[in-house]
């Protein structure tokens, strides 16, 4: 336990930030899983495109605001784009 008042405040702030970060990363994880489920289920191209756009938008936002590293955001976007572009070609 913190001994100083300022340390207690920093602990409270840290817990709030940690909860926010976890929530944002969880949202991203859910979006990525939803897109993968749609691809696996061979869903309509428009549904997959909507999932792709929302996932890329979330990745951009998290990368810019440094919730995830910019290179990780770029790598994930590249992987998603490759999945999306190849969707429907293998049929």
Swiss-Prot record:
Function, in words: Binds directly to 16S ribosomal RNA.
Biased amino acid composition, Basic and acidic residues: 1-18
Organism expressing this protein natively: Chlorobium limicola (strain DSM 245 / NBRC 103803 / 6330)
Assigned protein family: Belongs to the bacterial ribosomal protein bS20 family.
Keywords noted in UniProt: Ribonucleoprotein, Ribosomal protein, RNA-binding, rRNA-binding
Record-level Gene Ontology MF annotations: small ribosomal subunit rRNA binding; structural constituent of ribosome
GO annotation, cellular component aspect: cytosol; small ribosomal subunit
GO annotation, biological process: translation
Any single Pfam family the record assigns to this protein: Ribosomal_S20p
NCBIfam families with a match to the protein in the record: S20
InterPro entries assigned: Ribosomal_bS20 (IPR002583), Ribosomal_bS20_sf (IPR036510)
Keyword Ribonucleoprotein attributed: yes
Protein's recorded name: Small ribosomal subunit protein bS20
Region Disordered, residue ranges: 1-25
